[in-house]
């Protein structure tokens, strides 16, 4: 999860988030190299006589500054398209969870089970226990099995919402009348926090998301106790 004064991304917990982190570093390095080159040329022009006021045509230079940006864009686009395809592809999910956004809470339905559904509200600050996180804890966590592909079907009952869990690389819009989907896969057990990431009204900041990823055996025991 995030912590105060954090500069980088949250620790990756899913394969998708690991890919996104690597792509971020890849793109950031390209931006850094381009910025360094531009600043170097500007400094040379300001401190030396590196100017050609009489040059009217330079075919070689024009060719270079046309081809080079195209190559750079390809180096960015190819890994981006690969990750986009990975995020969209869902192969044989073991579980499907339907998520509905409301003003201002989330409701969840495990479609593979009968009568396994609940609402998830933020716990008010006055009701928090020692060690719990303000504005991030909920009364009913979403319990899911780890290391298995899970499909989330996401929509909304009223206005636009966005279901986001940064450490899993998830951010999917919840749109009334439309069903979006996302893949959830966690490499390790634990609690993973998120929030609504679309301004949806006065209590927008009070719509936390808590995923509890557990081994399959514990998930089966939990689901049996909930039915």
Curated annotation (Swiss-Prot):
Membrane-topology annotation of the record: Multi-pass membrane protein
Highest rank taxon of the organism: Eukaryota
Catalytic reaction(s) noted: 4 Fe(II)-[cytochrome c] + O2 + 8 H(+)(in) = 4 Fe(III)-[cytochrome c] + 2 H2O + 4 H(+)(out)
Cofactor: how bound: Binds a dinuclear copper A center per subunit.
Mitochondrial intermembrane side: 1-14, 88-227
InterPro entries attached to this UniProt entry: CcO_II, CcO_II-like_C, CcO_II_C, Copper_CuA, Cupredoxin, Cyt_c_oxidase_su2, Cyt_c_oxidase_su2_TM_dom, Cyt_c_oxidase_su2_TM_sf
Modification type Phosphotyrosine: residues: 218
Pfam families cross-referenced by the UniProt entry: COX2 (PF00116), COX2_TM (PF02790)
Annotated Cu cation A2 binding sites: 196, 198, 200, 204
Listed GO biological process terms: ATP synthesis coupled electron transport; lactation; positive regulation of vasoconstriction; response to ethanol; response to hypoxia
Subcellular location field: Mitochondrion inner membrane
Residues that bind Mg(2+): 198
Keywords: Copper, Electron transport, Magnesium, Membrane, Metal-binding, Mitochondrion, Mitochondrion inner membrane, Phosphoprotein, Respiratory chain, Translocase, Transmembrane, Transmembrane helix, Transport
TM stretches of this protein: 15-45, 60-87
Cofactor(s) essential for the protein: Cu cation
Chain positions recorded as Cu cation A1 binding sites: 161, 196, 200, 207
NCBIfam families membership: CoxB (TIGR02866)
PANTHER family: CYTOCHROME C OXIDASE SUBUNIT 2, CYTOCHROME C OXIDASE, SUBUNIT II
Subunit structure: Component of the cytochrome c oxidase (complex IV, CIV), a multisubunit enzyme composed of 14 subunits. The complex is composed of a catalytic core of 3 subunits MT-CO1, MT-CO2 and MT-CO3, encoded in the mitochondrial DNA, and 11 supernumerary subunits COX4I, COX5A, COX5B, COX6A, COX6B, COX6C, COX7A, COX7B, COX7C, COX8 and NDUFA4, which are encoded in the nuclear genome.
The protein's name in its UniProt record: Cytochrome c oxidase subunit 2
Source organism of this protein record: Rattus norvegicus (Rat)
Annotated gene: Mt-co2
């Amino acid at each position: 999860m995030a912590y105060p004064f954090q500069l980088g991304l949250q620790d990756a917990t899913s394969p998708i988030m690991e890919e996104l982190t690597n792509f971020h570093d890849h793109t950031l390095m390209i931006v850094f190299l381009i910025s360094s080159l531009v600043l170097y040329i500007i400094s040379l022009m300001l401190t030396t006589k590196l100017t050609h006021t009489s040059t009217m045509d330079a075919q070689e230079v024009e060719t270079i500054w046309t081809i080079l940006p195209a190559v750079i864009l390809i180096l960015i686009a190819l890994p981006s398209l690969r990750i986009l395809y990975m995020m969209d592809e869902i192969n044989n999910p073991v579980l499907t969870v339907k998520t509905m956004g409301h003003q201002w809470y989330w409701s969840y339905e495990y479609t593979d089970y009968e009568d396994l559904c609940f609402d998830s509200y933020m716990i008010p600050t006055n009701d928090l226990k020692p060690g719990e996180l303000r504005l991030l804890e909920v009364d009913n966590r979403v319990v899911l099995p780890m290391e298995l592909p899970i499909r989330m079907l996401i929509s909304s009952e009223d206005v636009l919402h966005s279901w986001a869990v940064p450490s899993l690389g998830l951010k999917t819009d919840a749109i009334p009348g439309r069903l979006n989907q996302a893949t959830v896969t966690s490499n390790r057990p634990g609690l993973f926090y998120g929030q609504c990431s679309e301004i949806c009204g006065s209590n927008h900041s009070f719509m936390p998301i808590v995923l509890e990823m557990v081994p399959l055996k514990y998930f089966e025991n939990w689901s049996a106790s909930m039915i």
